[in-house]
């Protein structure tokens, strides 16, 4: 059993925010792999899905970003899922737009959702870092992540979420390097291998 968590803020007001790309990716997995309907559980919206040979719970916390760990810890305890089998998909300022990296453990890089999960559950979970780029000035970060993706960004956002969903069985199987490589190749094949500016193909 895996616990796959997308981070974001609940409600229509935040649905298109850059901070909510984790929700978007989990929604793409749910659609593509015919998950059960999401229902309110564990202080979030949860669905069941089979990815390859692995059963997984998809979770979108309803606690707002800064309290994400409450929902994650509740679901993790209920299903007795080892921390190494908890996978968190989140926005990453320090990666270029349309890039993806997977890592286990490590720092939180100022991400309040990760900080909350680490405080509640521990640090040794897997993170799928979904690059959104950086606005260039630390003072602009708050507004940047809580603004919607621009119209020019939406094509790569949709392609990245689709690629994550396409190869989610590798992620569930623990084949992180293969998953990361497949997503990279898929994005390169769609022309997103070198996004110089937000939304722009090279």
Curated annotation (Swiss-Prot):
Keyword Hydrolase belongs to the record:
yes
Question: According to its UniProt record, which reaction does this protein catalyse?
Answer: an N-acyl-L-alpha-aminoacyl-tRNA + H2O = an N-acyl-L-amino acid + a tRNA + H(+)
Q: Where is this site: Discriminates between blocked and unblocked aminoacyl-tRNA?
A: 9
The UniProt record lists the EC number as 3.1.1.29
Q: Where is this site: Stabilizes the basic form of H active site to accept a proton?
A: 91
Compartments, record wording? Cytoplasm
What is the name attached to this protein's record? Peptidyl-tRNA hydrolase
Q: Which residues form the active site?
A: 19 (proton acceptor)
**Gene source species:** Methylobacterium radiotolerans (strain ATCC 27329 / DSM 1819 / JCM 2831 / NBRC 15690 / NCIMB 10815 / 0-1)
The text of the family note is: Belongs to the PTH family.
SUPFAM superfamilies, alphabetized? Peptidyl-tRNA hydrolase-like
| Binding residues annotated for tRNA, in chain numbering | 14, 64, 66, 112
Q: Which GO terms describe its biological process?
A: protein quality control for misfolded or incompletely synthesized proteins; rescue of stalled ribosome
Q: Which InterPro entries match?
A: Pept_tRNA_hydro (IPR001328), Pept_tRNA_hydro_CS (IPR018171), Pept_tRNA_hydro_sf (IPR036416)
Q: Does the keyword Hydrolase apply?
A: yes
Top-rank EC class of the record's enzyme? hydrolase
Q: GO terms for CC?
A: cytoplasm
């Amino acid at each position: 059993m895996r616990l796959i968590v997308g981070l974001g803020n609940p409600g229509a007001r935040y649905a298109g925010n850059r901070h909510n790309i984790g929700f978007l990716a989990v929604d793409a997995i749910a659609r593509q792999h015919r998950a059960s309907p999401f229902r309110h559980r564990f202080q979030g919206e949860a669905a069941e899905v089979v990815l390859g040979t692995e059963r997984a719970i998809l979770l979108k916390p309803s606690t707002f970003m800064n309290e994400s760990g409450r929902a994650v810890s509740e679901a993790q305890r209920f299903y007795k899922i080892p921390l190494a089998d908890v996978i968190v998909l989140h926005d990453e300022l320090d990666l270029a737009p349309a890039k993806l990296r997977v890592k286990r453990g490590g720092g939180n890089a100022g991400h309040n959702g990760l900080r909350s999960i680490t405080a509640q559950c521990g640090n040794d979970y897997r993170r799928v870092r979904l690059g959104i780029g950086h606005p260039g000035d630390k003072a602009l970060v708050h507004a940047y992540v809580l603004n919607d993706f621009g119209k020019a960004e939406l094509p790569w956002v949709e392609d990245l979420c689709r690629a994550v969903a396409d190869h989610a069985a590798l992620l569930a199987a623990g084949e992180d390097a293969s998953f990361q490589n497949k997503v990279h190749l898929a994005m390169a094949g769609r022309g997103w291998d070198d996004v110089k500016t937000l939304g722009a193909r090279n």
